[in-house]
């Protein structure tokens, strides 16, 4: 039936990614709507008590409660899994809900996790503060160095967890090498792929077991809603992750799922155009600031690795001034086009000072260890004409003496 073509994986897995992003997962109702329907309902009715009992027993196909299943949410999950090349996906309320769930569902007291040093501030809180409360130990390594992963692994190590590119320092992790180290030891690799999205990087193709996302970022792409996602094998999603999420309740709403579905339709176009814009803006800044951390530029120490793993550089990068927080804040305050915002992945250009925003809650010694100094600024380049962004940065840099 054509109205369910988007659910037929024998068809959809033959499509190219740009087509999958528009049509993957779509299941039209009897009305034949061209845009996915929003099923704003908390529950579902049954024709008889026996049907209700059969559904809860898993003997009858159908919905029971929107904390567990929702047609709009399931369309989004099918589409993300398709783009990722994964067997299954589970969405959640936020990216951090996804990161928390993907770790807690598979770790218990006495287990050990190895995590990448460069990470989003809340992810470092999760591994450094929350997990130890449950008797789970974490070792932090420079994720760029495969030998450090080897040295940190123990008999009780259950998970390798890292971002690539990392937020906000743009560290790039050798996916093939680190995933191979984990697989040889029976360790599950969880990759936060939010900066790249499956449009630019598919970690599972390099050996990752699980990928996790803040779908708030590039997947939505317009700064509208919060959402998170985890992709993996059907066994992992249904047997390991789902029991945790269905009983703890980080359920994505149907409306937010629909918004992300709409965002995915333009993901391929947006992220490639923003990558092009980012390169142009980065090339300009490279001539004006003391240091730039942009994986798309040859000056990045891991440029070759980044370009081998990614289809394009992405819209986000970091750079440094030389006058500390005062100069960094002065630069932000002098901007007239670029917004001061701690979000990323938006169609608008956004800039933030991570040490005083996204990583404010990280202890100073850990921030410095991560490379999040008072000089560091993070820039998300949007869909504006890059020359307008460059001119705004030019005048702001001049005002702070750069």
Give residue spans per PLM region:
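Conserved PLP-enzyme active-site core in the AAT-like
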Residues: 6-12, 18-30, 88-293
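Glycine-rich beta-alpha junction loops
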Residues: 26, 40-46, 195, 217, ...
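N-terminal "arm"/small-domain region of PLP-dependent enzymes with the aminotransferase-like
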Residues: 2-70, 78
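Conserved N-terminal alpha-helix of the aminotransferase class I/II PLP-enzyme fold
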Residues: 48-97, 122-129
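A common structural junction motif
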Residues: 248-249, 334-345, 396-402
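Conserved C-terminal alpha-helix-loop-beta "cap" of PLP-dependent enzymes
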Residues: 293-377, 381
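Short amphipathic alpha-helical segments
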Residues: 61, 87, 226, 256, ...
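PLP-dependent enzyme catalytic core of the Aspartate aminotransferase-like
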Residues: 1-5, 128-129, 137, 349-402
């Amino acid at each position: 039936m054509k109205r369910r073509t988007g659910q037929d994986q024998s068809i959809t897995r033959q499509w190219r990614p740009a087509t999958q992003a528009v049509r993957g997962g779509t299941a039209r109702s009897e009305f034949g709507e061209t845009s996915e329907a929003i099923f704003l309902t908390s529950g579902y009715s049954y024709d008889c008590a026996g049907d209700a009992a059969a559904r809860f027993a898993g003997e009858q196909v159908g919905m029971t409660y929107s904390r567990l299943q929702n047609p709009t949410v399931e369309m989004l999950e099918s589409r993300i899994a398709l783009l990722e090349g994964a067997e299954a996906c589970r969405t959640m309320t936020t990216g951090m809900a996804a990161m928390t769930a993907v770790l807690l569902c598979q770790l218990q007291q006495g287990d050990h996790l190895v995590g990448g040093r460069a990470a989003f501030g809340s992810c470092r809180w999760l591994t450094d503060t929350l997990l130890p409360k449950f008797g789970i130990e974490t070792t932090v390594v420079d994720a760029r160095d495969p030998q450090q992963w080897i040295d940190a692994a123990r008999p009780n190590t259950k998970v390798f967890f890292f971002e690539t590119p990392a937020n906000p320092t743009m560290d790039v992790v050798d996916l093939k090498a680190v995933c191979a180290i984990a697989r040889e030891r029976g360790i599950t690799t969880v990759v936060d792929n939010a900066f790249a999205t499956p449009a630019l990087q598919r970690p599972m193709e390099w050996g990752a077991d699980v990928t996790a996302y803040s779908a708030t970022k590039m997947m939505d792409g317009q700064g509208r809603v919060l959402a998170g996602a985890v992709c993996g094998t059907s066994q992992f999603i249904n047997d390991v992750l789902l029991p945790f999420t269905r009983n703890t309740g980080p359920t994505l709403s149907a409306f937010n799922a629909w918004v992300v579905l709409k965002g995915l339709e333009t993901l391929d176009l947006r992220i490639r155009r923003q990558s092009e814009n980012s390169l142009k803006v980065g090339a300009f800044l490279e001539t004006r600031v003391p240091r730039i951390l942009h994986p798309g530029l040859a000056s990045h120490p891991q440029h070759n690795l980044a370009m081998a793993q990614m289809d394009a550089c992405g819209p986000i990068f970091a750079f440094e001034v030389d006058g500390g927080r005062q100069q960094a804040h002065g630069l932000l305050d002098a901007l007239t086009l670029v917004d001061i915002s701690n979000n990323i992945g938006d169609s608008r250009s956004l800039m933030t000072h991570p040490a005083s925003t996204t990583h404010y809650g990280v202890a100073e010694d850990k921030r410095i260890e991560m490379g999040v100094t008072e000089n560091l600024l993070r820039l998300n380049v949007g869909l504006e004409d890059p020359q307008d962004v460059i001119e705004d940065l030019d005048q702001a840099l001049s005002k702070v003496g750069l």
